Amino acid sequence: MAVLREVELASQVSVRGEPQPGFPVESNTATGDVLWLGPDEWLVLGGREEDYPDAAAAVDVSANRVCFELAGEDVEDVLAQGCSLDLHPSVFPPGGCAQTLLARAQVILHRTDPERFRIFVRPSYEPYLRAWLEDALTSPRSSLRRR
């Protein structure tokens, strides 16, 4: 049985510029709590602006996104109902991340484990996406159920 829950994160920092030591530099990857979002853009979970003095820009964006966690053996089936990315583990393994659309809402998907995703969405879309995910969990296409 899977769980859909909102995750409280300590902070989120957007870092722009040259890669910092230990940052991922390949598309669709994450290193720990550092998500690669583009050629010169990362999202650091739990970081602080002052931790990146050599970055072109480091901005606290903690209020910019709400984070959901979706976990369960059929998590890919739930997400496939509203996302066109191939989320099979051979293509999107643990540590993978991507900016995409989920049910027409712009999100960041981060696969943290084989059966667990974090979904980052703008606060204005949070009620819509929460309702969509709850509906998707009860879909006949999924054996997942929310608690």
Where are the predicted features?
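Basic, glycine/lysine-rich polyanion-binding surfaces/domains
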Residues: 1-147
